[in-house]
Amino acid sequence: MAFVALPAGAQDTPAPAKMTAQQDHQQMMDQLHITSLRPGADGNHPQAPNAANYDEAKANPYPKLPDPLVLKNGKKVKSAKVWWSKRRPEIVEDFDREVYGRVPKATPKVTWEVTGTTQEKNGDVPVVVKKLVGHVDNSAYPAIAVNIDLTLTTPANASAPVPVIMEFGFVFPAGRRMPPPPAGSGLPWQQQVLAKGWGYAILIPGSVQADNGAGLTEGIIGLVNKVQPRKPDDWGALRAWAWGASRALDYFETEKAVDARRVGIEGLSRYGKAAIVTMAYDQRFAIGFVASSGEGGAKLHRRNYGEIVENLAGSGEYHWMAGNFIKYGGPLNWNDLPVDSHELVALCAPRPVFISAGAFKGDAWVDAKGMFLAAVGAGPVYKLLGKKDLGTTEMPPIETALTDGEVAFRQHSGGHTAGPNWPTFLEWASRYLGGA
């Protein structure tokens, strides 16, 4: 019989309490004194009573958005100083409390270990691939281990530290793979990045926090909470994934191959949501590529088009958000939210952010126009800080890039993918990240 030595204190630590997502969702509703929620939009059955709306004439029940440049006391923000010292903190507080949740003040230290280094070729470019694990200090609660999975790839022939684009990477179950890119879509995005002389990194969000409500007593949230259920303003998975990206950037600041001042963040779909949350909260990230992020990402919460607030308030997706967000799918409505996603984009200012969407066929759920309008709504903040906005308030034709300013937008003709927008993003990003 083999015996395994446990860390000091582990023998006295109870195993994580197992709750289903439905049970955890219900206990959060109980904390909030909510007895019922409105159903989310049904994207699969057009005849359902709660079928997703795709009629633009019905898409704007609340056309008036919160003004990002008006303080809570009603005074207008007329200077960058007042934005940074007063208005921006107000917006951050609202997102913390009501939308994404608060990161605890004392999160555990992460110690990075290089577990493997190989010399390879990606396409015809010699590269150095480093496999890394970020060991999260679990001495306060040894029953939960969190080890962040990160891979860094840099050009082997670089003569100086290079910019890096970090992606929140998908991991598919055995037997499933990411759908292949459409025919004629060009080089894989990694090879396009390498062609610029830059590096890329892939962070696995599930190694930081599970993508389900049952996992809230595991991962970094479960570790910090010592298995106890979340409070209504505790962080959800999107903030946890963003926290993981920030810890990866901590490592890049020590990595000689990387210019940590020129690190971008990219993500698609739920990881597009995580990418813009990362950009908004960590000002060290130089640039963002936010692809098909939809509701909970760059899409306006006040839009009735495709996925809506009620979807994220339900038991399938609530774990992405703060518990308090559930209120807006039940007793409160979208217009009661103190903020909207144009202010999330504004939190990225003055740094450049690229909002990406696909065509109606294949990507209608994420509401391309709702994301465009959020980019428009962030424009006044960018201009206040001396940067360029989108340059128009009119939704452009498909495949028309709006890339003259620090807020950029393009709707490609593909489906739910970032792929067709990579060349446009990289050309635009070169203005800010420069060469290797």
Residue ranges and their predicted role:
Residues F172-P181, S246-E310, G316-E317, N324-G329, ...:
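Primarily recognizes the serine-hydrolase "nucleophile elbow" in alpha/beta-hydrolase
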Residues Q11-G101:
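N-terminal pre-domain segments of enzymes
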Residues W320, K369, A374-A436:
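C-terminal catalytic histidine-bearing segment of alpha/beta-hydrolase fold enzymes
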Residues I220, I287-L344, D367-E394:
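Mobile cap/lid helix-loop segments that gate and shape the active-site cleft of serine hydrolases
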Residues A160-R261, G294-R303:
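Cap/lid segment of the alpha/beta-hydrolase catalytic domain
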Residues A5-P7:
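N-terminal signal peptide c-region/cleavage motif recognized by signal peptidases
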